[in-house]
Each structure stands twice: as C-alpha cells, then as structure tokens.
Amino acid sequence: MNHDPLNDVINTIKNASRIGKSEVIIGPASVMIGRILKVMQDYNYIKSFEVIEEERGGKFRVELSDTINNCGVIKPRLSVKNSNIERYESRYLPAQDFGIIILTTTKGIMSHIEARKLGIGGKLLAYVY
C-alpha cells in the first residue's frame, strides 16, 4: 500500500474542523501541500498557515476557519479537459458555485474556477466545500 501525504493532510484538516479545533499541525511539509493550503486560504477555507522549520522536512501550522463542511482527496488522480470539469464538479460538490475542486495544471495548482477562466485542464487532486 502506498502512502499518500495529501490524503493525510486533508483528513487531518477535516477531522480537526469537525471536532472544533482552531489550529492543527500537519507534517511533513512539502511544496505541493503548501500550494494546496494557499488555494484553500484564497477561498477562505482556512484562515492562515505557516511553515514550522524542523530538522527533517518541517511542518505546517494551519489556523482553521469554520467554513469547511467536507473535504476529500480525489483518487485516482483523474486527468480532465477544461470542457469536462463541470462533470466532476457535479460529482464531487453538492451544488454549483458551492465549494472548489483543487487541480494541478501546467500553470500550477489552482481551483477549478481559475482553471476554467484560463481555459485549461489538469489532474484532479481534492475537493473542499
């Protein structure tokens, strides 16, 4: 069985949010996870995050907001064209214009809303609403 750090991060955030914690420590830190947290911060799903430097890898301290109802990792990491994003939006999000799908594109990690504006597709990573 392979280890999935992104799944660990998303589940840690979801569980901490459900029990009402205001802050959570996530490790190990990586560039990809930092960019995903930045997208979540841009859409106000988390208040802030910072890197805690340690000897091996470091960790993130994430300050949670009360706006997360559910979040999860999309597996397998499906490749989607810009024209097909709407299909996955209806599959993973409860309503149109409610929540975001995070995907990785040739322009970096972004939400499905930004990818649609740029007219590009990518690989689905996670959803948050």
Swiss-Prot record:
Entries under SUPFAM superfamilies matching the protein: Ribosomal protein S8
Domain of life: Archaea
Entry-linked InterPro entries: Ribosomal_uS8, Ribosomal_uS8_CS, Ribosomal_uS8_sf
Function: One of the primary rRNA binding proteins, it binds directly to 16S rRNA central domain where it helps coordinate assembly of the platform of the 30S subunit.
Membership in a protein family: Belongs to the universal ribosomal protein uS8 family.
Summary of subunit composition and partner proteins: Part of the 30S ribosomal subunit.
Protein name listed in UniProt: Small ribosomal subunit protein uS8
Lineage, uppermost ranks: Archaea, Methanobacteriati, Thermoplasmatota, Thermoplasmata, Thermoplasmatales
